[in-house]
From Swiss-Prot:
This is YcgL domain-containing protein PM0444. SUPFAM superfamilies: YcgL-like (SSF160191). It comes from the Bacteria. PROSITE patterns: YCGL. It comes from Pasteurella multocida (strain Pm70). PANTHER family: PROTEIN YCGL. InterPro entries: YcgL-like_sf, YcgL_dom. Transmembrane segments: none annotated. Residues 1-83 form the YcgL domain.
Amino acid sequence: MLCAIYKSTRKMGTYLYVAKRDQFDVVPEVLRNAFGPPVFVMMFNLAGEKALVNAEKAEVRKQIETQGFYLQMPKEDDWLFKL
């Protein structure tokens, strides 16, 4: 399963995963407004062997299949956000 990954222009470290590139109709309007204009990062194969850095592939896939998207928030303990 391929998914498209976008980064937020308003919240550093926040990413949105959707099933198809530029398909945001499944994302609630409130979330789209808070996320800001999405910036395309890459297509990612959730069935492949490569791991995601800050998310579990199985959870991403499950969320995309059930609600149409997955929202990755920054880790609270990430030292870069404390600078």
